[in-house]
């Protein structure tokens, strides 16, 4: 669809603060509590993570805990985690989240419609939500574990054509980790037309560096793992993660 050469080139290396500025952390599992959201906000602000996401009912609380105008954005999920909600329901949820202070939204794509080949429905849904919440950016989650390679290509193309800011690999609700092989399918499809967020099973600096070389510009990482990775980056020679070569 798009020439891969149009992708933004990654930096040669990252300092710990630069790494944190590429990572979203979240408390979006069903069991997460108010205390978890408060802890999330504290960690996100202290460490300089680019975004903190909470389930919709906790977004107003999260917004109140994260200083406006700081390094950390507040986000929330739409149609989460199945993606099977109606377009009207998803749109209403997205608008409410934006009104409650969410600065970016991660929406689950309608996997069933993708697998049914109903691409027009999916395209129209994404466009409707993008328009309803503008200028708040929308990331669209594919949940790669549920899609074939051809479905990944088709879904990625739809996202790139629909005005979303990012295509995202997964919700973190499935056990499958994001792989370089699956990411390549997305990159080959979207080129530089849309940014890519990798989420799910990312646990090493080597994985981050490899994904950045492919074109990934944002990561969704378990909170404690994210903190540990920033610490590991600081402990590398020169205190920087080498993206051009290998980590450490």
Curated annotation (Swiss-Prot):
Active-site residues (renumbered): 106, 168, 197
Q: What is its main location?
A: cytoplasm
This entry's Enzyme Commission designation comes to: 4.1.2.4
Q: Read off the InterPro entries from this record.
A: Aldolase_TIM, DeoC, DeoC/FbaB/LacD_aldolase, DeoC_typeI
Q: Which reaction does it catalyse?
A: 2-deoxy-D-ribose 5-phosphate = D-glyceraldehyde 3-phosphate + acetaldehyde
* UniProt keywords, alphabetically: Cytoplasm, Lyase, Schiff base
Localisation: Cytoplasm
Q: Which GO terms describe its biological process?
A: 2-deoxyribose 1-phosphate catabolic process; carbohydrate catabolic process; deoxyribonucleotide catabolic process
Q: In which pathway does it act?
A: Carbohydrate degradation; 2-deoxy-D-ribose 1-phosphate degradation; D-glyceraldehyde 3-phosphate and acetaldehyde from 2-deoxy-alpha-D-ribose 1-phosphate: step 2/2
**One Gene Ontology cellular component annotation held by this UniProt entry:** cytoplasm
Give yes or no: UniProt keyword Iron.
Answer: no
Q: Which cysteines are joined by disulfide bonds?
A: none
| Any one Gene Ontology molecular-function term assigned to this protein's record | deoxyribose-phosphate aldolase activity
Ribosomal protein among keywords: no
User: Which top EC class is given?
Assistant: lyase
Which PANTHER family has this protein been placed in? DEOXYRIBOSE-PHOSPHATE ALDOLASE
Function per UniProt? Catalyzes a reversible aldol reaction between acetaldehyde and D-glyceraldehyde 3-phosphate to generate 2-deoxy-D-ribose 5-phosphate.
> Which family is this protein grouped under?
Belongs to the DeoC/FbaB aldolase family. DeoC type 1 subfamily.
Name of the protein:
Deoxyribose-phosphate aldolase
